[in-house]
């Protein structure tokens, strides 16, 4: 009878599924694994870090470094895909070079943690994570620049920036040129006022 009713139920036979929460007791949460696997250099795996004698500390440090590295990689991908105007290429290229140098430092650190079984001091880790702190303003400007490059095909904003830079340089040159004659006049006046030496 129940088998016959099963075929008549509009949504199929009711089966109660027990909720099984994610395992939080593991020393390596899934999110940590994903972040580290994305950021690891080629040939290095999470298992290499777990073999470390102080695996808990090294795993936490590897996760923090991985998050930082993945953010840097995201910036680099966005600027590789964007077409940067000529007037902005020098600024963008400088920031890209800095980000690539930080990425190489983090990769070398991860290799040392995986292969050499080393952990880094918390103070050194904080310094490495705050490596971009001094460049935060430049990164904000890069964020605006990347958004503008992607959204605006006309590049009118780049022309405006270029005009502002050129006008500022022009004003500076005018100021320098206006100061030069004053200096020359002062030196000539000083030469005229000097009394010639009288020979006896």
UniProtKB/Swiss-Prot annotation:
Oligomeric form and interacting partners: Oligomerizes. Interacts with ORF42; this interaction mediates ORF42 incorporation to virions.
Record keyword Ion transport present: no
Parts forming coiled coils: none
Lipidation (S-palmitoyl cysteine): 8
Compartments in which it is found: Virion tegument; Host cytoplasm; Host Golgi apparatus
Post-translational events: Phosphorylated. Palmitoylation is necessary for Golgi localization.
Keywords from the UniProt entry: Host cytoplasm, Host Golgi apparatus, Lipoprotein, Palmitate, Phosphoprotein, Virion, Virion tegument
Xref: Pfam families: Herpes_U44
Function: Plays several roles during the time course of infection, including egress of virus particles from the perinuclear space and secondary envelopment of cytoplasmic capsids that bud into specific trans-Golgi network (TGN)-derived membranes.
GO cellular component, one term: host cell Golgi apparatus
Stated family: Belongs to the herpesviridae UL51 family.
Amino-acid biosynthesis as UniProt keyword: no
Listed InterPro entries: Herpes_U44 (IPR007619)
Name this polypeptide is given: Gene 55 protein
């Amino acid at each position: 009878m129940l088998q016959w009713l099963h075929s008549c139920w509009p949504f199929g036979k009711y089966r109660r599924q027990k909720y099984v929460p994610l395992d939080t007791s593991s020393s390596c949460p899934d999110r940590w694994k994903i972040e580290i696997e994305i950021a690891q250099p080629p040939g290095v795996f999470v298992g290499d870090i777990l073999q470390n004698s102080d695996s808990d500390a090294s795993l936490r440090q590897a996760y923090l470094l991985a998050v930082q590295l993945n953010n840097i990689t995201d910036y680099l991908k966005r600027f590789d895909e964007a077409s940067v105007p000529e007037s902005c290429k020098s600024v963008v290229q400088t920031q890209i070079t800095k980000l690539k140098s930080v990425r190489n430092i983090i990769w070398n650190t991860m290799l040392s943690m995986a292969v050499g079984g080393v952990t880094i001091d918390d103070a050194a880790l904080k310094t490495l994570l705050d490596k971009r702190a001094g460049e935060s303003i430049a990164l904000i400007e890069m964020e605006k620049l990347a958004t503008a490059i992607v959204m605006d095909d006309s590049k009118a904003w780049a022309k405006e920036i270029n005009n502002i830079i050129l006008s500022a340089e022009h004003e500076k040159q005018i100021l320098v040129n206006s100061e030069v004659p004053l200096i020359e006049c002062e030196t000539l006046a000083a030469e005229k006022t000097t009394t010639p030496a009288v020979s006896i």
